[in-house]
């Protein structure tokens, strides 16, 4: 719980590291921060799941966690601008979350809709647990000037009870796309370059082999 509270306080912050280009050492550091950012997202889920039927304070806190969770994603749950291969400005669709129903993958849902629906689940009790450490399965690679991407995977368990009976008991491997962008800001001491980490789509994957 202490970790969740700390993550809530720091939710609006993104990891920054001064750099001109990503070196191997910086890649290792950034990938560790990537795993920590995914852990932060995962830590919010148990505090959101099934809270709509709980006391008022729990519901209000869950809504704050939803907002904090969206801050970790590119576009913060909304469409976001990008430049295509021809140099044209485009709008990319908002990030999505894919879940399963008793082991069958569902159609991906907008993250901005998934989190409130997680809160509104009509079960007596809901548990969302991470069953493994987050693992980088595709290391940072350059996709355009000043932009890198990576993917990471983790196992997640979802359980739901109704009338005291366990009615859903799923365990899925999830893959998270992550973007690392070079940013430049002006300070009184001159320009400063840093790397911003943002999460992308989360999909069901079968690529869990160590």
What label would you give each PLM region?
Residues 89-135:
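Short, solvent-exposed helix-to-loop capping segments enriched in aromatics
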Residues 55-87:
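Short, well-ordered alpha-helical segments enriched in acidic and aromatic residues
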Residues 14-15, 74, 120, 138:
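Short, flexible coil/linker elements and helix-boundary hinge sites characteristic
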Residues 1-24:
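Bacterial Sec-dependent N-terminal signal peptides
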Residues 42-52, 73-77, 118-122:
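Sec/Tat-exported extracytoplasmic proteins
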Residues 52-53, 78-81, 85-92, 96-104, ...:
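Intrinsically disordered, low-complexity coil segments
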Residues 19-67:
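Short, low-complexity N-terminal intrinsically disordered segments enriched in polar/charged residues
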Residues 127-210:
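Exposed beta-sheet edge and beta->alpha loop/turn motif
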């Amino acid at each position: 719980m202490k970790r969740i509270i700390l993550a809530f306080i720091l939710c609006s912050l993104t990891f920054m590291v001064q750099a001109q280009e990503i070196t191997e050492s910086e890649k290792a550091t950034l990938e560790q921060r990537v795993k920590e950012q995914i852990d932060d997202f995962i830590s919010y889920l148990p505090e959101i799941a099934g809270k709509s039927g709980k006391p008022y304070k729990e519901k209000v806190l869950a809504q704050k966690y939803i907002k904090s969770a969206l801050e970790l994603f590119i576009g913060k749950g909304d469409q976001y601008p990008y430049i295509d291969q021809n140099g044209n400005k485009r709008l990319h669709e908002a990030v999505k979350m894919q879940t399963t129903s008793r082991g069958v993958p569902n159609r991906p849902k907008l993250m901005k809709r998934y989190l409130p629906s997680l809160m509104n689940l009509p079960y007596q009790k809901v548990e969302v647990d991470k069953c493994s450490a987050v693992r980088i399965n595709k290391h940072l690679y350059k996709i355009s000037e000043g932009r890198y991407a990576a993917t990471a995977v983790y196992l997640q368990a979802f359980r739901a009870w109704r009338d005291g009976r366990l009615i859903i008991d799923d365990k899925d491997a999830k893959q998270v796309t992550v973007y690392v962008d070079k940013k430049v800001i002006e300070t009184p001491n001159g320009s400063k370059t840093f790397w911003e980490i943002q999460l992308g789509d989360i999909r069901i994957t079968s690529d869990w082999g160590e």
